[in-house]
């Protein structure tokens, strides 16, 4: 995995390189004439709302890193349950800002954010815990991954809204694979009375291909790499895995008990 695992410092340069590329693509698409109020692959969000969302979250990250560096107290985490609604409201709150002005603000924020991430030391990458507005304290490397999620997936959203055939970047997908298990663990909502079960997840190709055993119980979801020969398996390529985890498509291949697969795939709420 090495340089393709953003959770380790060895993956930092690769992750930031891909984030830069996706951010440039995102703003190049968003600044085109005639697209500002166009629909996107993110339900009820227009292109301008995606830009507003990036401005909103990135500027909040600056405050959060300042708090982490200064040992300052912040309010308790909002929680991920209300994240989709609040993020949508915040993104739409910038609708009165002209296209050129908001795109330039987004580019400026990104330049500042990438500089902040580039300056992180090996100790910072995994050891500096930064209080995320929705999720609470997380290692700093998650903020690089959040930038990739936003720029990578929302670039896909802009293209999806155009109605043209397209696909997710392989580099984006490969880097995000490990983080999708974290996303699933944060958004699983099993019924308290439901019987525990296991399922296998197979990523068929790319830098983070492999098999993962996922255990689901009343308290949530846990996962670990391991043999899945005895389990029902959901098989994905990297791109369809990321897009399925984000609720953008219904991807994957079931190998085994469809009822187990359906039960698993319907565990999650969207953020």
Listing of model-derived features with the role each one plays in the protein:
Residues 1-42:
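Non-cleavable N-terminal signal-anchor transmembrane helices
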Residues 2-13, 60-119:
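Short, helix-capping/interhelical loops that line the mouth of catalytic, cofactor-
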Residues 15-22, 53, 102-109, 143-147, ...:
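Amphipathic alpha-helix face/heptad-repeat signature
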Residues 34-81, 130-189:
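Short, contiguous alpha-helical
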Residues 93-156, 160-161:
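Contiguous mid-protein beta-loop-alpha structural module that forms a pocket-lining wall or clamp
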Residues 174-214:
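A glycine-rich beta-turn/hairpin centered on an aromatic-Pro dipeptide
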Residues 203-233, 237:
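Acidic/His-leaning functional-site neighborhoods
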Residues 226-271:
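C-terminal interaction segments
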């Amino acid at each position: 995995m090495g340089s393709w695992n953003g959770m380790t410092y060895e993956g930092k340069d690769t992750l930031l390189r891909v984030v830069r590329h996706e951010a440039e693509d995102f703003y190049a698409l968003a600044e085109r004439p005639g697209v500002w109020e166009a629909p996107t692959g993110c339900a009820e969000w227009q292109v301008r709302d995606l830009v507003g969302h990036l401005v909103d979250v990135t500027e909040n990250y600056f405050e959060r890193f300042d708090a982490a560096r200064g040992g300052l107290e912040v309010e308790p985490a909002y929680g991920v349950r209300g994240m989709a609604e609040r993020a949508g409201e915040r993104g739409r709150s910038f609708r009165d800002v002209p296209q050129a002005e908001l795109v330039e603000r987004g580019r400026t924020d990104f330049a500042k954010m990438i500089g902040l991430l580039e300056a992180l030391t090996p100790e910072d990458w995994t050891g500096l815990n930064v209080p995320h507005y929705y999720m609470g304290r997380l290692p700093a490397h998650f903020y690089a991954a959040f930038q990739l999620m936003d720029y990578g997936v929302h670039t896909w959203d802009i293209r999806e809204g155009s109605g043209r055939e397209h696909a997710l970047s392989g580099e984006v997908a490969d880097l995000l694979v490990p983080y999708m298990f974290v996303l699933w663990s944060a958004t699983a909502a099993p019924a308290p009375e439901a019987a525990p079960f296991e399922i296998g997840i197979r990523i068929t190709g790319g830098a983070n291909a492999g098999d993962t055993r996922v255990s689901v119980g009343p308290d949530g979801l846990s996962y670990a790499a391991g043999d899945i020969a005895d389990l029902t398996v959901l098989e994905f390529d990297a791109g369809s895995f990321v897009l399925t985890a984000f609720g953008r498509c219904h991807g994957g291949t079931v190998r085994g008990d469809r009822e187990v697969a359906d039960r698993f795939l319907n565990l999650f709420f969207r953020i």
